[in-house]
Amino acid sequence: MTKKMTFPDGFLWGGATAANQCEGAFDADGRGLANVDVVPIGEDRLSIITGRRKMFDFEDGYFYPAKESIDMYHRYKEDIALFGEMGFKTYRLSIAWSRIFPKGDEAEPNEAGLAFYEDLFKECHKYGIEPLVTITHFDCPMHLITEYGGWRNRKMLGFYENLCRTLFTRYKGLVKYWLTFNEINMILHAPFMGAGLCFEEGENEEQVKYLSLIHISEPTRHLRI
């Protein structure tokens, strides 16, 4: 006799996006430049995401898909209505760090960025959709890369903690479920996207990657929030 298997009551069915995959509006309402913005499509993409070719701003002759993406920043109400029509019970999304702290090291957040996500979360609840939020999905403000070297620098822990405190305080009651990082292991394979890492000629890349892994995994092990 075959045993009937069922999902438990309250199981969260849904879908997922990342901010850089869908939001677009890369410079709207005070948002700062991020590493994911300057990753182009084309033959140089691999050398850029692996940190061997530096691209810290937009350059002529390249197409940057994250600049516009699917423009969810301006169309999220339409998108979430469709999620509701599909029967989503949860929506996993990520926060664009540079929409909250444009440079990453500011003391005070960007109110327009906070308001955007607050409205988005409220729209989810309107359709009975539980937000599941990844704090960082391949996303680092460019200033933290050019000024501090990305996650090779332990100071990133303080900036990340400030981001977390800001999010947890502002969205208390709107978001129950939080994830720290998406695919930390990608530091080893796509270090510019995974941790904002770029390498100098002759630098010990493996050493930098594993040092960054130590830093970036600390919030996951024991977030001090």
Sequence positions of predicted segments:
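N-terminal structural segment of carbohydrate-active enzymes
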Residues: 2-110, 120-123
